[in-house]
């Protein structure tokens, strides 16, 4: 590069302005228009497009009204905690808006009957069951670069087995192979995900670190790269069972927003996942309505606008199902009071410490 190009401009702000214009025009000639621009003039960066998670409470906890498009989202938790259910609800919500969705089933465990019950249009859902991790991530890269896919699910990171591991013997030690695969793939994917405005949801599993004396021994598979590249990380846990008489009909579930680059993190929300139904919308409307003071609770009785809804939670849920007009009014009032609810669902101090430990590893 010539000395003229390296010359530092000194003097008035007019000189600096001219120098900046010259530098910007040189960058645009070399790398194309739009390589550098003022942030305020970039409309795409100002408004974050979102897709509902399928849970009203989680949409409020995320701070932007849903899961962000053009970003990487990680959903992790123990077995049978609702990770795939949450991802499929996001697919169903995207399809309702006319979006195209794809599901890379590395675990080879997707149940189309269950997906249909959650509201997923399985006839339009693209599915791939790859043979190894490299193939799965190449398929993901091609789909993202096409710009035609709105939501892409990868289930799961733990099942992305590197080709070398498949071709080797059962007892071969291959340390860090999957972590290197994920790191390389995310370096390639992250820019095209943003340009194509595709939301990529990685479902991940939990492992235990050996010899941890203080803090949480839990960690996620696939190394640390995904923790850094993800804009949103959701920790989903089953905290109890929902019973009808002696039969278990669902799970009480808690989701913590462990990382959020778009709004304040560390919020948590609880909802019911009913077997064969997914996230219970009526149960959530009832619980959030009580938190916001829209639904009154007196003992075991629930009431709205001086009208009794029923004794006990299940009876009140049945009332909401039978009265869609009242349900719509309560939901509208909850959305209008979302700021108040968001303050109330901020994680409390006993569990805040574990969240801080987890995010410190990011």
Swiss-Prot record:
GO terms for molecular function: ATP binding; ATP hydrolysis activity; ATP-dependent DNA damage sensor activity; damaged DNA binding; single-stranded DNA binding. ATP binds at residues 77-84. InterPro entries: AAA+_ATPase, DNA_recomb/repair_RecA, DNA_recomb/repair_RecA_CS, P-loop_NTPase, RecA-like_C, RecA-like_N, RecA_ATP-bd, RecA_C_sf. GO terms for cellular component: cytosol. The keyword Cytoplasm applies. It is found in: Cytoplasm. PROSITE patterns: RECA_1, RECA_2, RECA_3. Pfam families: RecA (PF00154), RecA_C (PF21096). CDD domains: RecA. One of its GO terms (biological process) is SOS response. Keywords: ATP-binding, Cytoplasm, DNA damage, DNA recombination, DNA repair, DNA-binding, Nucleotide-binding, SOS response. Belongs to the RecA family. Can catalyze the hydrolysis of ATP in the presence of single-stranded DNA, the ATP-dependent uptake of single-stranded DNA by duplex DNA, and the ATP-dependent hybridization of homologous single-stranded DNAs. It interacts with LexA causing its activation and leading to its autocatalytic cleavage. This is Protein RecA. The lineage of its organism: Bacteria, Pseudomonadati, Pseudomonadota, Alphaproteobacteria, Hyphomicrobiales. The gene is recA.
């Amino acid at each position: 590069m010539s000395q003229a190009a390296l010359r530092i401009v000194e003097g008035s702000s007019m000189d600096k302005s001219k120098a900046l214009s010259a530098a910007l025009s040189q960058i645009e000639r070399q790398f194309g228009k739009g390589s550098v621009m003022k942030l305020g003039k970039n409309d795409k960066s100002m408004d974050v497009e979102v897709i509902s998670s399928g849970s009203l409470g989680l949409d409020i906890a995320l701070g932007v009204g849903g899961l962000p498009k053009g970003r990487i989202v990680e959903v992790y938790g123990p077995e049978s905690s609702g990770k795939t259910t949450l991802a499929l609800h996001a697919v169903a919500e995207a399809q309702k808006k006319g979006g195209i969705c794809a599901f890379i089933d590395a675990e080879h465990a997707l149940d189309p009957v269950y997906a249909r019950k959650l509201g997923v249009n399985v006839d339009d859902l693209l599915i791939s069951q790859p043979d190894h991790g490299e193939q799965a991530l190449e398929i993901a890269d091609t789909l993202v670069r096409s710009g035609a896919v709105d939501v892409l699910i990868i289930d799961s990171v733990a099942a992305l087995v590197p080709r070398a591991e498949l071709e080797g013997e059962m007892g071969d030690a291959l340390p860090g192979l999957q972590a290197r695969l994920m790191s390389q793939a995310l370096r390639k994917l992250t820019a095209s995900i943003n340009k194509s405005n595709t939301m990529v949801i990685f479902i991940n599993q939990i492992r235990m670190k050996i010899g941890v004396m203080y803090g949480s021994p839990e960690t996620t598979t696939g190394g640390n790269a995904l923790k850094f590249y993800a804009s949103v990380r959701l920790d989903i846990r089953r905290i109890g069972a929902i019973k009808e008489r002696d039969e278990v009909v669902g799970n009480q579930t808690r989701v913590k927003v462990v990382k959020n680059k778009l709004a304040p993190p560390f919020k948590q929300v609880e909802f019911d996942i009913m077997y064969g139904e997914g996230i219970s919308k009526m149960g959530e409307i009832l619980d959030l309505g009580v938190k916001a003071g829209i639904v009154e609770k007196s003992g075991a009785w629930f009431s709205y606008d001086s009208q009794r809804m029923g004794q006990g939670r299940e009876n009140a849920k049945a009332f909401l199902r039978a009265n869609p007009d009242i349900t719509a009014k309560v939901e509208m009032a909850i959305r209008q009071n979302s700021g108040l609810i968001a303050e109330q669902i901020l994680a409390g101090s006993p569990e805040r410490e574990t969240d801080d430990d987890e995010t410190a590893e990011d």
